[in-house]
Amino acid sequence: IARKAGLRAVPHGGELLGPEHLREVLDFLKPTRLGHGVRAAESPDVLRRVIDEGVAFEVCPASNVSLGVYSEASGVPVRTLMDAGATIALGADDPLLFLSRLTAQYETLREQGFDDAELAALASSSVEASFADGASKRTWKAEIQDWLAADPSNDDDAEAHGA
C-alpha cells in the first residue's frame, strides 16, 4: 500500500525475533532498508541475502541494548555486518524514548576500536542508505571525506576527530 502511494517503507525486523523473522520480511515486504536487522549476523545465509539484495541496515546500538537484544553496546555486531560488506546506516532510534544521540553511537564505536576511516565509511554508508536526492548525497559524502582528510594535529581539526 505504501509503495503504491509513493511512500517509503522501512520495516523493522531481525532485532527481537532473530534471523528467521528477517527471511519473512525479505520474502514478503521486499525492503530496501531494514529497521535494525542486526541479528542477521547470527545467520550467514540471511546476512548474505540481505547484502546481495542491496538492503541497508539501520543499526541503533543504544536501542538494541535498551530493549535487551544485547547486554552491552559492544555486543551489537556492527563490525560483523561491516566486514561482511553490509550497507549500514548508524542511527539513534527514538532519541526521546531511548535518550540516545547519534554522536553517542559513533563514540561507542570509537571506544570499540573503530578508526577514523571506518567511522567515515559508516557515515558515508548512512548517507547512501538515506532517501535523500543524489545531489545531497554527493555533498554530504564530500563533507565526510573532508572530515577524514582533516589534519587532527591542527587544533581546529582535532576536536572534529575526537581528540
Label each PLM-derived region with a short phrase.
Residues 1-3, 76-85:
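Short, hydrophobic/aliphatic alpha-helical segments
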Residues 10-16, 81-101:
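Short acidic/histidine-rich active-site segments
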Residues 12, 36-37, 71, 92-96, ...:
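Hydrophobic alpha-helical scaffolding
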Residues 18, 43, 98-102, 137:
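Alpha-helix N-cap/helix-start motif
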Residues 20, 71-79:
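Charged helix-capping and loop-helix junction motifs
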Residues 25-40, 80-88, 105-117, 121:
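Structural recognition of alpha->loop->beta junctions
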Residues 104, 114-163:
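Mid-to-C-terminal alpha-helical segments outside catalytic/metal-binding sites
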